[in-house]
Amino acid sequence: MSRRHSAEKREVNPDPKFGNVILTKFMNSVMYAGKKSVAEGIVYGALEIIEAKTKQGPLPVFEQALENVMPTIEVRSRRVGGATYQVPVEVRSVRRQALGIRWLISAARDRNEKTMTERLSAELLDASNGRGNAVKKREDVHRMAEANRAFSHYRW
């Protein structure tokens, strides 16, 4: 990691259908091997399924799902003397978003539905209702941080 300069953050363009920057980041995370049009098809297909099932706009459901998955606190390893402590620290907003997106997609990929579009829509619906593996992952991270609260004075 460079000590002199931190990398410049690139500007992410909003997606063409909804004009949402977070949705573009989500699509970029779904994308494999540079196949953006395939990723767009998967995400937009999932949002259409959500719209059909909930009879409301898919964007609020997506945003609620992401909000329910984003962690506020996590543990980081800190070596003191010979021991390694799991120290709870607050998560920065950019990392919160990145972790939320990553967990949603990995939870969707682990599901049993037939196509990725169906898996993603089901996981987004579950997450927006406070269920699903992505929300469980966040709860586990929060529980871990709570269990290691005694080491919070070792913060950076």
Curated annotation (Swiss-Prot):
It holds the Pfam family Ribosomal_S7. GO terms for molecular function: rRNA binding; structural constituent of ribosome; tRNA binding. GO terms for biological process: translation. GO terms for cellular component: small ribosomal subunit. The keyword Magnesium does not apply. Belongs to the universal ribosomal protein uS7 family. HAMAP family: Ribosomal_uS7_B (MF_00480_B). This is Small ribosomal subunit protein uS7. It comes from Rhodopseudomonas palustris (strain BisB18). The lineage of its organism: Bacteria, Pseudomonadati, Pseudomonadota, Alphaproteobacteria, Hyphomicrobiales.
